[in-house]
Amino acid sequence: MVTNLQKELIAIETIKVLYQQIKELRETVNPKRLGKYSDTFFDSLSEDWFDGINLSSWMRGLNTSLGQSFFENVAHILCNGTKKEFTAKKKSLLQLSQSQKLRIANIITDLSNGNFYPDSLADNDEISEALEALEEATGFTADVFFEDDDHVVCIELKTVKPNKGVFKVEKQKILEAKEALRRSYPKKKVKFFIGFPFDPLSIEPTGFDKQRFMKYSVGFDKYFAESEFLLAAELWDYLSGTKQTMETILEIINSIATVDFIENFDFLQQKENATDKKSEYINLLSKWFLLREIILVENRESIRSKTSSNKRIVRVFNQDVFIIKREDDKYKVEYNEERNAILSSFV
């Protein structure tokens, strides 16, 4: 199951994205003119709020970089993974034989000409036969990378409407990456997926149809088998190892992304509310899944009594829950993890 700490970390990512997007849009444009974005996301800027939001609406309401960052961070939280680069810049290029590169290129040609079907197992069996002197493999970055005792898993997160022609390039890159990873992790099974956060064609927020989705993206079924990509709920369940993870993510988003989001955020930033309006403060923290912060509020008097003679700790106690910065006309919001860690040691 998704743990309480994971829920809190996902909630923090949601808060960061919402605050940044809303503050910037309020300063630059009239929300009612944003027809190209989803109503459900941007109604949080107006008086009308649509009860219930899905990841399709959430993603369309974010700019590309902000949305990509959100999904990557949530993925890392769920699987305890990281983003990992195997690139020349990072001096972490893997190795591959020239014959393997040639065989992969031939497979791509056969796929392009319709002479070969995208069966990942057949691809891997054929390529792995090649053994000879090694050279540097093509660099790549895994948006999600995690390793356990038996497996190495890489996932590349994509937008749900990739550009035409991208799948040929992606297939070749993934085939090369899998073979190079096998050489680096010879005792482990290597898996490499493309991941799509949601199915834009599904009526249900967490629903998906892989065959329909493959037809929706031009050229997808020419290069990839169903087993080579993870879609919507399938992706999130795979990352967490538990069912109904996508429902949990949506529950968190819906609890936070309301019409009074900015007012709620400001309420939590006002430290005196933790004392003067303690019950209301704790209720909002609970609604926003900020469970570690609840522990601090409930133990506020005890912490103060233990630290009253320590000016440094008193100053930490008086810091904001969230740190707000503005860099290059962009808002950056971070949960004050250092404050929480220091104060939690006195609970």
Predicted regions and their residues:
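Nuclease-adjacent, charged terminal/linker segments that flank catalytic cores
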Residues: 1-93, 275-347
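Conserved catalytic cores of phosphodiester-cleaving nucleases, focusing on short active-site segments
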Residues: 79, 142-161
